[in-house]
Amino acid sequence: MSQFSFTKMHGLGNSYIYVNMFEEQIPEEDLALVAEKVSNINTGIGADGMILICPSDVAPVKMRMFNNDGSEGKSCGNGLRCVAKYAYEHKLVEETVFTIETLAGIVTAEVTVEDGVVTLAKIDMGAPRLTRAEIPMLGESETPFIRENFLYNNHRYAFTAVSMGNPHAVIFVDDVEKAPLTTLGPVLETHEMFPERVNVEFIEILNEDEMNFRVWERGSGVTQACGTGACAAVVAAILNGKMERGKEITVHLAGGDLMIAWTEEGNVLMKGPAEVICRGVYEYKIEA
């Protein structure tokens, strides 16, 4: 029987099991299965996935994120805020502004601290990637995918594809509560046009400063929040002429609110909370 200490944290209800790999050891070949096991709500701890906080050669810490189906993702906005909180509070970093390595690249985090506790984290998510090759999507590699139609169940849905280090398909609807989240979501996620699958967001524009947001996450299904998805949604809204670039937009997710801005300089900034749920020790056995 093997075991490791963990901290369960969430960003707006998007929860992961966080493991400090400065102190713990999980064999590389076991990571996918362990992520699947520990995320199981019935036989594990229950979460949207597992995130490892690892040493890095190019930043103070590195984040590795695994979905609850065991697949490894390149980035996670809510996860990054929680990693920033953990790293500062556990003295893996000393400054309130620092970098985090991800499979999608290096991002900059800035934490707001009150009495030694991180209450808010802002992440510079970098510039969005808009060409089919960068997302990735099939088709002309240098061509963006903006407001293109997808026929599903005799209804045409126009979506815009954006990568924030991971792929997103953003669809604008009149009412997110009536959006076909659990039906169209998995169909688009696994569609052949997305070789690495895709996250699917349904967006309802409320006014020039606010939007409602619901998400079907690649590898996890319906979740309470998706930080990279909120960033992609704001970028898509601006590309479609629905919002202004340079303004801070409030994104209302099922789990709470994020503040997102696509700056004139080109990067996307995400600001929101990160909270600890519980800590403990997880025991597991990998069958031969």
UniProtKB/Swiss-Prot annotation:
Reactions it catalyzes = (2S,6S)-2,6-diaminopimelate = meso-2,6-diaminopimelate
Q: Can you list the GO cellular component terms from the UniProt entry? A: cytosol
List of residues binding substrate: 14, 67, 77-78, 166, 199, 217-218, 227-228
Keyword Cell inner membrane applies: no
Q: Is the Membrane keyword given for this protein?
A: no
Q: What class of enzyme is it?
A: isomerase
Sorted alphabetically, which InterPro entries does this protein's record hold?
DAP_epimerase_AS, DAP_epimerase_DapF
Q: Which domain of life is it from?
A: Bacteria
| Enzyme Commission number(s) of this protein | 5.1.1.7
* Predominant localisation class: cytoplasm
**Subunit note:** Homodimer.
UniProt-recorded name of the protein = Diaminopimelate epimerase
Q: Which organism is it from?
A: Bacillus cereus (strain ATCC 14579 / DSM 31 / CCUG 7414 / JCM 2152 / NBRC 15305 / NCIMB 9373 / NCTC 2599 / NRRL B-3711)
For this protein's source organism, the top of the classification is: Bacteria, Bacillati, Bacillota, Bacilli, Bacillales
